[in-house]
């Protein structure tokens, strides 16, 4: 179904709602553009597992092709220069140096778990915190992104 077709379904249901015809509006949504609940089974990754993926990908952000840094080096700067190179454990942007967002590697599911992607190694790549946040639950096609080659191992 195209985005235009989806918009037309919502438009048709909206017109019915304006006429206070909730039942027909709901029927149109349920029959043509219903919400599908998905059971998500997600595992958590420890630092050793993440590091293995970072090394496999050569510390390259696979969504941008940019180099990323070993997380330890950024934490060294925050330890020595806490005011000039701040880090916040909950990633508050106004309290975390931008280097953490741009250069700290994290892992991401290429095909999001939330949309049916598998929690398997071939669906996991290295990316920056920033690109992981931007990508969220979108697909590469939706964002018009591609996967860049891994770096030297």
Predicted regions and their residues:
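Intrinsically disordered, low-complexity, charge-dense segments enriched in Lys/Arg
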Residues: 141-149, 153
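Short cysteine-rich loop/turn motifs with clustered Cys
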Residues: 47-104, 128
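A generic secondary-structure signal for well-formed alpha-helical elements
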Residues: 68, 131-135, 151
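A boundary/linker detector
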Residues: 1-52, 58, 65-71
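Short beta-strand-alpha-helix junction that forms the catalytic/metal-binding core
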Residues: 58-61, 101-133
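Short Cys/His-rich "knuckle" micro-motifs
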Residues: 71-74, 135-140
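Single-residue recognition of alpha-helix boundary sites
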Residues: 76, 119-120, 143
């Amino acid at each position: 179904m195209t985005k235009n077709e989806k918009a037309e379904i919502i438009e048709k249901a909206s017109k019915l709602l304006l006429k206070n015809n909730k039942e027909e509006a709901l029927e149109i949504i349920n029959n043509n553009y219903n919400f599908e609940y998905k059971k998500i089974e997600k595992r958590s990754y420890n630092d050793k597992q993440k590091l293995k993926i970072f090394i496999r990908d050569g510390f390259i952000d696979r969504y941008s092709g940019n180099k990323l840094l070993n997380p330890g080096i950024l934490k060294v700067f925050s330890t020595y220069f806490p005011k000039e190179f701040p880090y916040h454990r909950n990633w508050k942007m106004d309290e975390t140096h931008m280097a953490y967002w741009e250069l700290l590697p994290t892992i991401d599911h290429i095909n999001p778990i939330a949309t049916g992607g598998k929690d398997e190694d071939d669906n996991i790549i290295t990316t920056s915190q920033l690109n992981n946040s931007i990508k969220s639950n979108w697909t590469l096609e939706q964002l018009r992104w591609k996967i860049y080659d891994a770096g030297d191992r």
